[in-house]
Amino acid sequence: MTTSTIDIGGKTVNRLGYGAMRITGQGVWGPPKDHDEAIRVLRRAVELGVTFIDTADSYGPYVSEDLIREALHDGSGYGDVVIATKGGLTRSGPNVWPPLGRPEYLRQCILMSMRRLGVEQIDLWQLHRIDPNTPREETFGEIKTFLDEGLAKQFGLSEVTVEEIEAAKAAGLPIAAVQNMYNVGNRSAEDVVDYCDAHGITFIPWFPVNAGKLANPGGPLDEVAKQHDGATTSQLALAWLLRRSPVIAPIPGTSSVAHLEENMKAEELELSDDEFQTLADAA
């Protein structure tokens, strides 16, 4: 089995985590259609061994963080579970996500996330997007200030280039994690993955099971699945990511307990060298 742990937020966690975007309403706006199922999903994830959950203040907005606290906070914290969150986006409607990197807004983001999650320090706080309309030195400067104040144990970036990672490091920010879209079907962030691998930075791929045409009937994922006793294409997509690099920590999301249980079985899959390369080449 692929080595399944990684250090995030000062704790050793299982690499196959859970992304808590889909426990909100349609368009990642408002409450979930089934509140009780959302709570069940979160609790079942932990029962299945998930110790890394990723969310953001913009999911809902605020809904995902509130649900995580309701489902998992034990009165003093989250035990062995690392809760990562993000800030730096505003919401003006379903599927609308304008970035805002003003220092005062980012400080509000992290302070309000701390309040909603019921913690005195965020395990991993990530800048959801770099705002092109705010000077980077202002954004990075404020983040460094609240990191120095101890508001977060670790810091990460989302949807960034290698150049932007280097710029953040040059501004004095210790980069513990990078979260970009990346999956077996979309490898546009390959250079960022390689950079993270070389520098020991956790890489968190979002949309990890979105394999595109590779998952079509008769496609590469489908053909490999036939060699693994009915494994699903989603499970294979996750297994491929876990094999791709030891710094990768996928965060598949779902609002269904059944789908969650299916995804978690990906850790049991072991791709052969030929299978891994077949899928790598197919993209």
Please name every model-derived segment:
Residues 31-45, 101-117, 161-166:
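Short, acidic/polar
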Residues 11-16, 49-51, 77-81, 119-123, ...:
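Short, well-ordered coil/turn segments that N-cap beta-strands
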Residues 1-81:
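N-terminal binding-site loop/beta-alpha segment at the start of enzyme catalytic domains
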